[in-house]
Amino acid sequence: MPKHGKRYRALIEKVDRNKQYTIDEAAALVKELATAKFDETVEVHFRLGIDPRKSDQNVRGTVALPHGTGRTVRVAVITKGENVAAAEAAGADVVGSDELIERIAGGFMEFDAVVATPDMMAAVGQKLARLLGPRGLLPNPKSGTVGPDVTGMVRGLKAGRIEFRNDKTGVVHAPIGKASFDPSNLSANYGALISALEAAKPGTAKGVFLRSAYMTTTMGPSIPLTLSGGAQA
């Protein structure tokens, strides 16, 4: 196991490992645990009662965090026609059609999210799937990044809409803000994420859905969270 420094060990002492914290308690505690010289991201990690080997039990969805994530999201929009002006007006950072596809294929990656209109998806899939797919950036209707409403997609991403999905071990990792956030805003974002997760529970998943949860900052120790029984089948 890797050895932690004195700073980290001192932070661990502030967390009661025999306690499960309420979200309000944890949101207040992260203020004490975030001691890095930058504004640390606050994340939550949920272990789900699913079998990730079964495709019908995988969890994926999006949620609009009421107080955003605290980070600036650079959005690229692949579209054409009148949607170009709509995307620019909505605040997209880079907009284009076939020429943008070629630019990305050539190595341009100065964006954090990509959205596309349906009329561009054939070209996107053909030329960018292998490049964007492994990075989690390939536009997909399930993640709210493919559709005719360019304005809504761009504004949603800019305002703090995030995508969540389980990893191969059945755990969902998601940001809910920054350590500088007011604790009440972190709590509200957490509540929105919990609701979205429970709504995304697969019908084939049995028993307790939300098995365990932890909150952590970028450089800090994890805080065990209480779950009121979890979502049952």
Swiss-Prot record:
Gene Ontology MF annotations: rRNA binding; structural constituent of ribosome; tRNA binding
Recorded superkingdom: Bacteria
Pfam name, any one: Ribosomal_L1
Protein keywords: Repressor, Ribonucleoprotein, Ribosomal protein, RNA-binding, rRNA-binding, Translation regulation, tRNA-binding
Family to which this protein belongs: Belongs to the universal ribosomal protein uL1 family.
Protein's job: Binds directly to 23S rRNA. The L1 stalk is quite mobile in the ribosome, and is involved in E site tRNA release.
Any one GO cellular component localisation term in the record: large ribosomal subunit
Keyword Repressor: yes
Name of the featured protein: Large ribosomal subunit protein uL1
GO biological process: regulation of translation; translation
InterPro entries the record matches: Ribosom_uL1_bac-type, Ribosomal_uL1, Ribosomal_uL1-like, Ribosomal_uL1/biogenesis, Ribosomal_uL1_3-a/b-sand, Ribosomal_uL1_CS
Keyword tRNA-binding tagged: yes
Organism of origin: Deinococcus deserti (strain DSM 17065 / CIP 109153 / LMG 22923 / VCD115)
CDD domains associated with the record: Ribosomal_L1
Subunit structure and binding partners: Part of the 50S ribosomal subunit.
